[in-house]
Amino acid sequence: MYEGNFLHLQNKVFNTKHNLLEKTMINRELIRIKIVQLTYAYYQNGNRNMDNAEKELLFSLAKAYDLYNYLLALIVSVTQEERHRVEIAASRAVREGTEAPSSRFANNRFAVQLEENKQLNLFMETQKRRWEDDMEAVRKLCDQIEQSTIYQEYMGGEEDSYEADREVWRKIYRTLIQENPDLDAVLEEKSLYWNDDKEVVDTFVIKTIKRFDPANKEDQELLPEYRDEEDRDFAVKLFRATILNADDYQHYMSESSRNWDFSRLAYMDVIIMQIAIAEMLTFPNIPVTVTINEYVDLAKLYSTPRSGGYINGMLDTIARHLIQTGKMMKTMPEPRPRRPYNDRQADRTPRREGRRPTIAQTSAQRVAAREQTEDAGNNDQVE
C-alpha cells in the first residue's frame, strides 16, 4: 500500500513539473529527440570528441529556438505583405472609383500585437535572417491564405473581435503553415537543423498564438528558451551519462536480452535503450514509467516497426533489475499477470493504419547522413 501511494505521489509531482515545462520552448521531449539523433551521429561519425558533441547538442537546441521565433516572424511578414496589397488595391479603387478593399486581415489585431511584440523584435534584431530575403515564399503563402476557405469565412464573418482575429491565425497556421512542403523546403535551405525541428516547433507556435492576450499589448511574453538552468543541465547531463557509461548500460541490456543475440539488435534500439537507462539512473525525480513511455514512443518513430514493444519489455526488465540490486532507488508498479495467449488474441483490436506521429518523423539513416556531411571540427559553426 505504501509503495503504491508513493508511486502515485511521485507521478503527481512529476506531472506538475511537466506542466510547467510546457511553458518553455525547449522541453524534455525535444531534448530527448536531439539526444537520440546526436548519440547516433556520435557513434556513426567516428568523431568521439565529447566537448564538440556537447557543443553540437546545445547549438542544435538553440537552432530550434531560432526557428520558433522565425516562424512567429513569418506571421508578421505575411501581415505586412497583406497590408501592402491592400494599399495598392485601395489606390487603384480611388483611381477607378470602385469600392475600397477590406483591410480586416491586414489589420488583424493579433498579428499587429505580434508585430509590436518587444521580445520578438529584440530577438529578430540579433538575427541575420529576414523573411524580407524570401519574399517569394511569403507572397506564395499569402496567395494560399487568400484562396483558402478559412480566409474567406473570416473576411465575410460577422464577429469582429480580438478572439476571432487570433483564432483565424491559429487555423491558418495549422492548415497552411504546419503542413506546407514549399515552406519546409525554404526552411531546410536556411538551416540543416530546421527540417528535423519544425514538426515539434510548430506545436509551440500554436500554443503561443493561443496564449496571446490583448491586455498584455507589446509586452506579451513568448515562450522562453529554457525555464531555468536545470533544463539546460538536463540535456548535458543526459547526453554525457549516455556516452560515458555506455559499457555499463549495454551490459545491462545484454543481461536482459534473454534468448536474443544482443549483437543482432537493431543499432537504433541499442541507442534508444542506452539513453533511457541513462535517464533512469541519472534523474531520480523522473518516474521509471515516464522514462519508458517516452523512449518507447521514440523507438516507434526512429527504429523498426516492432521496436516499441520489444524496448518496452527490455526496459521494464532492466529497471526492475536495477531496483532489486540497489542500483536505482525508484519504485515501479507490480507487473500485471500475463493472460493466456488465446484470450489476448480475442481482445485485440485492429491496428490503426496511417497514424500520423506527433513528433518529428526523421529516419536515423537520414540523421546520420546529414551529420556526416558536416565538418566535425566546426560543429558549433554549422548553420
Language model regions located:
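Class I Rossmann-like S-adenosyl-L-methionine
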Residues: 8, 19-383
